């Protein structure tokens, strides 16, 4: 009888062990990513331990079971910044990072800024890592992640990254990717971020998939002074291939995303809801295939004044895509929103022979399926 009493406990532990790991597989450009593979899961208990696991040279599956709060761990800085968007209580102000205020906003009012140093630079993530959250428990607060300088084969799934100096532009980014390859970010929630939720820098980042993520733009501070975050997704790489699928972008006001450099972007089945300014900025060197997306209460689906790149996407299905990606393109949908349209076949030619994500009809499902806790 004593042995029998232990059986449920053993069974529960076995079930938990089986459940710990990456769920599903990436679609699109990062479809061959494996992350930490079958490495034995590790469970950091301190911020130092988390930093160590992410930054070492071992293949790892790293499981977050609690909040790792970096706020205050590196002290604070008080300095003079600027207020380019005004001094009202709901406006972001800027840190004078690299003399940005001095060189580019010399006419803006000067203001005192006090920011948390930990947010300024994210945690380095080295190659062959899977960083996953357990349920809704895995949170990194006050500091982001940096996947840079040749890092590759990385999966980030089912975590939240929050509260990185939200009042301050240049206060820090949630996820930075630069000169990387095979990165899959899936079911991640980002909220109350000072600068970009996602930024792909000017170096080439070859195969990236951002899927089923919740970009929560609601904030007490914004550059548009209206509780809608302006700095959301910035894709600026010299040779980037990015799949953006199934994401929910809520209460944004710009750069959602901003695409330029030499970036191939497949934006498919995303849901933009309550955007007070514009979603896409499509600049020089951007090739954007947009299909099956829903824009609801979005003032402008694409900013016309900065539109110098290439776009294929419309409100009707297109058989033109068949000879390039092996299927028809799916119509975008618009509700109380500005529209986007483009029929540049040069865009489709960039995707020929590439691993392209599937597409379904536009809808609101990302609102309930994207982000942490919705695997």
From Swiss-Prot:
Main localization of the protein described in the UniProt heading: secreted
Glycosylation sites: 128
This protein's UniProt keywords: Carbohydrate metabolism, Cell wall biogenesis/degradation, Disulfide bond, Glycoprotein, Lyase, Polysaccharide degradation, Secreted, Signal
Compartments it resides in: Secreted
Enzyme class label: lyase
Reactions performed catalytically: Eliminative cleavage of (1->4)-alpha-D-galacturonan methyl ester to give oligosaccharides with 4-deoxy-6-O-methyl-alpha-D-galact-4-enuronosyl groups at their non-reducing ends
Signal peptide: 1-19
A GO term, aspect molecular function: pectate lyase activity
Top-rank taxon, per record: Eukaryota
InterPro entries given in the database record: Pec_lyase, Pectin_lyas_fold, Pectin_lyase_fold/virulence, PEL
Record GO biological process: cell wall organization; pectin catabolic process
A GO term from the CC aspect: extracellular region
Catalytic center residues: 255
SUPFAM superfamilies per the UniProt record, alphabetical: Pectin lyase-like
Covalent S-S links between cysteines: 82-101, 91-225, 321-329
EC number: 4.2.2.10
Family matches, as Pfam families: Pectate_lyase_4
Protein family per UniProt: Belongs to the polysaccharide lyase 1 family.
Role noted for this protein: Pectinolytic enzymes consist of four classes of enzymes: pectin lyase, polygalacturonase, pectin methylesterase and rhamnogalacturonase. Among pectinolytic enzymes, pectin lyase is the most important in depolymerization of pectin, since it cleaves internal glycosidic bonds of highly methylated pectins.
Protein name: Probable pectin lyase B
Source taxonomy: Eukaryota, Fungi, Dikarya, Ascomycota, Pezizomycotina
Encoding gene (name): pelB
């Amino acid at each position: 009888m004593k042995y029998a009493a232990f059986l449920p406990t053993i069974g529960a532990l076995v079930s938990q062990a089986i459940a710990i790991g990456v769920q599903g597989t990436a679609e699109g450009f990062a479809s061959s990513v494996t992350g930490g593979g079958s490495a034995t899961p590790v469970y950091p208990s301190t911020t130092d331990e988390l930093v160590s696991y992410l930054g070492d040279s071992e293949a790892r599956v790293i499981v977050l079971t609690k909040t790792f709060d970096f706020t205050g761990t590196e002290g604070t800085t008080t300095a003079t910044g600027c207020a380019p968007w005004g001094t009202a209580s709901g406006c972001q102000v800027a840190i004078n990072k690299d003399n940005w205020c001095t060189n580019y906003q010399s006419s803006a009012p000067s203001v005192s800024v006090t920011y948390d140093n930990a947010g300024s630079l994210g945690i380095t993530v080295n190659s062959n890592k899977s960083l996953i959250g357990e349920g809704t428990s895995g949170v990194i607060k006050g500091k982001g992640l940096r996947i840079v300088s040749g890092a590759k084969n990385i999966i980030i799934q089912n975590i939240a990254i929050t509260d990185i100096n939200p009042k301050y532009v240049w206060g820090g980014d949630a996820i930075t990717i630069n000169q990387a390859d095979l990165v899959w970010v899936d079911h991640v929630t980002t909220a109350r971020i000072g600068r970009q939720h996602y930024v792909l820098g000017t170096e080439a980042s070859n195969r990236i998939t951002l899927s089923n993520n919740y970009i929560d733009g609601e904030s007490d501070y914004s550059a548009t002074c209206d509780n809608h975050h302006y700095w959301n997704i910035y894709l600026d790489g010299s040779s980037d291939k990015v799949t953006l699928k199934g994401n929910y972008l809520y209460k944004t006001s710009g750069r959602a995303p901003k695409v330029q450099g030499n970036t191939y972007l497949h934006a498919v089945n995303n849901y933009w809801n309550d955007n007070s300014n514009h979603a896409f900025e499509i600049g020089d060197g951007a090739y954007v295939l947009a299909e099956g997306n829903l824009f609801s209460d979005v003032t402008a689906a694409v900013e016309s004044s900065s539109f110098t790149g290439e776009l294929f996407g419309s409100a009707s299905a297109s058989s033109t895509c068949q000879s390039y990606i092996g299927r028809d393109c799916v119509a975008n949908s618009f509700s109380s929103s500005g529209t986007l349209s483009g029929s540049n076949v040069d865009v489709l030619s960039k995707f020929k022979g590439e691993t392209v994500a599937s597409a379904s009809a536009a809808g609101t499902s990302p609102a309930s399926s994207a982000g942490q806790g919705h695997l």
